[in-house]
Swiss-Prot record:
Family: Belongs to the papillomaviridae E7 protein family.
Function: Plays a role in viral genome replication by driving entry of quiescent cells into the cell cycle. Stimulation of progression from G1 to S phase allows the virus to efficiently use the cellular DNA replicating machinery to achieve viral genome replication. E7 protein has both transforming and trans-activating activities. Induces the disassembly of the E2F1 transcription factor from RB1, with subsequent transcriptional activation of E2F1-regulated S-phase genes. Interferes with host histone deacetylation mediated by HDAC1 and HDAC2, leading to transcription activation.
Record PTM text: Highly phosphorylated.
Location (main, coarse): host cell
Organism name: Human papillomavirus type 61
Thylakoid found in the keyword field: no
Location of the protein in the cell: Host cytoplasm; Host nucleus
Keywords associated with the record: Activator, DNA-binding, Early protein, G1/S host cell cycle checkpoint dysregulation by virus, Host cytoplasm, Host nucleus, Host-virus interaction, Inhibition of host innate immune response by virus, Inhibition of host interferon signaling pathway by virus, Interferon antiviral system evasion, Metal-binding, Modulation of host cell cycle by virus, Oncogene, Transcription, Transcription regulation, Viral immunoevasion, Zinc, Zinc-finger
Gene Ontology biological process: DNA-templated transcription; symbiont-mediated perturbation of host cell cycle G1/S transition checkpoint; symbiont-mediated suppression of host innate immune response; symbiont-mediated suppression of host type I interferon-mediated signaling pathway
Domain of life: Viruses
Database matches in InterPro entries: Papilloma_E7 (IPR000148)
Name of this protein: Protein E7
Subunit and interaction comment: Homodimer. Homooligomer. Interacts with host RB1; this interaction induces dissociation of RB1-E2F1 complex thereby disrupting RB1 activity. Interacts with host EP300; this interaction represses EP300 transcriptional activity. Interacts with protein E2; this interaction inhibits E7 oncogenic activity. Interacts with host TMEM173/STING; this interaction impairs the ability of TMEM173/STING to sense cytosolic DNA and promote the production of type I interferon (IFN-alpha and IFN-beta).
Length: 95
């Protein structure tokens, strides 16, 4: 543009529009692959859980009570807090 007002002859279109591929190149997972991913996640959860031996005393007769729990670290801490609080385990003889 050479002036204060644009005219049609001043507008020059040099670029041509290009064809753009609008197809997505993603591939969907088939059901077997998603099942494999689910089983891997389940295995990771199972690995996070471990078996822990817990030794406490009976809430009634005070004899030792042993049990095994399978849980994660966070759940074990919750069980620990419960056993330190009002929760009591009762032996089979007192049950």
């Amino acid at each position: 543009m050479h002036g204060q007002v644009a005219t049609i002859k001043d507008i020059v279109l040099e670029e041509r529009p290009e064809v753009v591929d609008l197809h997505c190149n993603e591939q969907l997972l088939d059901s077997s692959e998603s099942e494999e991913e689910d089983s891997v996640r389940e295995q990771l959860v199972e690995q996070a859980q471990q078996a822990y031996r817990v030794v406490t005393t009976c809430g009634i007769c005070k004899c030792p009570v042993r049990l095994v729990v399978q849980c994660g670290d966070a759940d074990l801490k919750v069980l620990h807090e419960l056993l330190l609080g009002d929760l009591s385990i009762v032996c089979p003889g007192c049950a």
